[in-house]
C-alpha cells in the first residue's frame, strides 16, 4: 500500500478512482492494484455501510414508517394488563422516547445530545411489573431477557457476573450484537441489592452495594465484552462487543419497608410524649398512596446508592391490586387465565365456564394469600386438577361449570354431558 507522498517523489500526479480528486485535494490517497481511493471516499463508504447495517437490524416495529405512539403503546398494554394506569402511561412515554432516540441517533441536528432514560418500577409482589416489561418487548418485537438481582455478585466472586445479563440477551437473538443493542432487559428484585445501611460500607458487600457499583456502567452505557456462545473468557478468545447505551434497562422490586421511610419523611408534627402525632387507623395512608410521594432521598435511605438512582431517572409506582382488579385480571385480558384454561378444555371438546361468584372467590383467596395476581394460577391449578385428570377419560362431556362452592372446596365441578345429563365429577 502506498500514499500520496511516495508518488509525489516519482513526479506523477495521482487521482482518486472514485471521486476524481487529485492527491493535492485530499489528505490521503491509498493505492491498490491500478486503482486509488481517497480518505473522503473511505469515510463516505463507511457511513453508507453503517446506515445499511442500521436499517437491517431494526425490528419490524422500528423499520416501519412510524414508531408506535405512546397512546398506541398504552392501548396495547391495556389489552394485557389490568389497572396501573399511571405506570402504563409513564412506561409508554419512556419507551417511545428511548426508541425514538435510537432511530434518530444520540445527537439532534442542533447538536443536542439525547440522554438515556432507564426505568425503575416500584410495586408489591404480583402487581404486574414483570408482565408490563414482557408485554412491551413483545409489542415492539425486540429481544427481551430477565435477570434476578439476587443472583448477581461482583466480578471475581461466586455468583453471576453482571455481564451475564448481556450474554442472556445475546442468546435471545442468536448472538447478534446489533439486535441485542435494541433489546429490553428487566432486572427483578432490585431492592434486594440495597446496602445494609445508608452510609457507605467500609467492608466488602459483594451482593449489595458491590452489585450496584458493577451495574452502574452497564446500565448507563458501556461497551460490554461478552464471550460468544457462552464460552468462558480467556485471552485468545474473540469477544462480542455490545453497546449497552442502546439497551433499555427496566429495574423492578417490591421495596418492602420503603413505605415506612416515606411515611417518616412526610409525617408532620412528629414528637414524643404529649407532642406526639397521634393517628387513627382510618387515617393511615395506604402503601400505594405513600409510594406516589417517593423521592430519590427515600431510595437512598432504603439502601440504593445515589449514583445508581441517577441511572434510573424514570421512576413509577404500581399499586396493590384489590379484589375487583383481580376479578378483572381473571377474565378480561386477551390472555386471561380463564381464557387459557378454557382453551385447554376446548381441546378436549368441552366448554369451561366460571360463574361470577367463582371469580370473586378466587380473587378473595389470592388477597388472603397476599400474592397478588401471581397467586391466581396456582389457585386455578388446584381447583381444576381433578377435572383435568378425569376429563380425557370421560366421553360426552360438553361443559364444565365452576362456581363458588367448588373454589371453597365444598363441592365438585359440575359436568354437563351431551345428552344434557348433569352430575358432579368424582374421583374413580
From Swiss-Prot:
The keyword Zinc applies. Pfam families: AAA_2, ClpB_D2-small, zf-C4_ClpX. Zn(2+) binds at residues 16, 19, 38, 41. Transmembrane segments: none annotated. GO terms for cellular component: HslUV protease complex. SMART domains: AAA, ClpB_D2-small, zf-C4_ClpX. InterPro entries: AAA+_ATPase, ATP-dep_Clp_protease_ClpX, ATPase_AAA_core, Clp_ATPase_C, Clp_protease_ATP-bd_su_ClpX, ClpX_bact, P-loop_NTPase, Znf_CppX_C4. PANTHER family: ATP-DEPENDENT CLP PROTEASE ATP-BINDING SUBUNIT CLPX-LIKE, MITOCHONDRIAL, ATP-DEPENDENT CLP PROTEASE ATP-BINDING SUBUNIT CLPX-LIKE, MITOCHONDRIAL-RELATED. ATP-dependent specificity component of the Clp protease. It directs the protease to specific substrates. Can perform chaperone functions in the absence of ClpP. This is ATP-dependent Clp protease ATP-binding subunit ClpX. It comes from Aliivibrio fischeri (strain MJ11) (Vibrio fischeri). The lineage of its organism: Bacteria, Pseudomonadati, Pseudomonadota, Gammaproteobacteria, Vibrionales. The gene is clpX.
Amino acid at each position: 500500500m502506498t500514499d500520496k507522498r511516495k508518488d509525489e517523489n516519482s513526479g506523477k500526479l495521482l487521482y482518486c478512482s472514485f471521486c476524481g480528486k487529485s492527491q493535492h485535494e485530499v489528505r490521503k490517497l491509498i493505492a491498490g492494484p491500478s486503482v486509488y481511493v481517497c480518505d473522503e471516499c473511505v469515510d463516505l463508504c463507511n457511513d453508507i455501510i453503517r446506515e445499511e447495517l442500521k436499517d437491517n437490524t431494526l425490528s419490524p416495529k422500528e423499520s416501519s414508517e412510524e414508531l408506535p405512539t405512546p397512546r398506541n403503546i398504552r392501548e396495547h398494554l391495556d389489552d394485557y394488563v389490568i389497572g396501573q394506569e399511571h405506570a402504563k402511561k409513564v412506561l409508554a412515554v419512556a419507551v417511545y422516547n428511548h426508541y425514538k432516540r435510537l432511530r434518530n441517533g444520540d445527537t439532534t441536528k442542533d447538536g443536542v445530545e439525547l440522554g438515556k432514560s432507564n426505568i425503575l418500577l416500584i410495586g408489591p409482589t404480583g402487581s404486574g411489573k414483570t408482565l408490563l416489561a414482557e408485554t412491551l418487548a413483545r409489542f415492539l418485537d425486540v429481544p427481551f431477557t430477565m435477570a434476578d438481582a439476587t443472583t448477581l455478585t461482583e466480578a471475581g466472586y461466586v455468583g453471576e457476573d453482571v455481564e451475564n445479563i448481556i450474554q442472556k440477551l445475546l442468546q435471545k437473538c442468536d448472538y447478534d450484537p446489533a439486535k441485542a443493542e435494541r433489546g429490553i432487559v428487566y432486572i427483578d428484585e432490585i431492592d434486594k441489592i440495597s446496602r445494609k445501611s445508608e452510609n457507605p460500607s467500609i467492608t466488602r458487600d459483594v451482593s449489595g452495594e458491590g452489585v450496584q457499583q458493577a451495574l452502574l456502567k452497564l446500565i448507563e452505557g458501556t461497551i460490554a465484552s461478552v464471550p460468544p456462545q457462552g464460552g468462558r473468557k480467556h485471552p485468545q478468545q474473540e469477544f462480542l462487543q455490545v453497546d449497552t447505551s442502546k439497551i433499555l434497562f427496566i429495574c423492578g422490586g417490591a421495596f418492602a419497608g420503603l413505605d415506612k421511610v416515606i411515611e417518616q419523611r412526610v409525617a408532620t408534627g412528629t414528637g414524643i410524649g404529649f407532642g406526639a402525632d397521634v393517628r387513627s387507623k382510618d387515617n393511615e395512608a395506604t402503601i400505594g398512596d405513600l409510594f406516589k410521594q417517593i423521592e430519590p432521598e427515600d431510595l437512598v435511605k432504603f439502601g440504593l446508592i445515589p449514583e445508581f438512582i441517577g441511572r434510573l431517572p424514570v421512576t413509577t409506582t404500581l399499586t396493590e391490586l384489590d379484589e375487583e382488579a383481580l376479578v378483572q385480571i381473571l377474565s378480561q385480558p386477551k390472555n386471561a387465565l380463564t381464557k387459557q384454561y378454557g382453551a385447554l378444555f376446548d381441546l378436549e371438546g368441552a366448554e369451561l365456564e366460571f360463574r361470577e361468584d367463582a371469580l370473586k372467590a378466587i380473587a378473595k383467596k389470592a388477597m388472603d394469600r397476599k400474592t397478588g395476581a401471581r397467586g391466581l394460577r396456582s389457585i386455578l391449578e388446584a381447583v381444576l386438577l381433578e377435572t383435568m385428570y378425569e376429563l380425557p377419560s370421560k366421553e360426552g362431556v360438553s361443559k364444565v361449570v365452576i362456581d363458588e362452592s367448588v373454589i371453597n372446596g365444598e363441592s365438585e365441578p359440575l359436568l354437563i354431558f351431551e345428552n344434557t345429563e348433569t352430575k358432579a365429577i368424582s374421583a374413580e
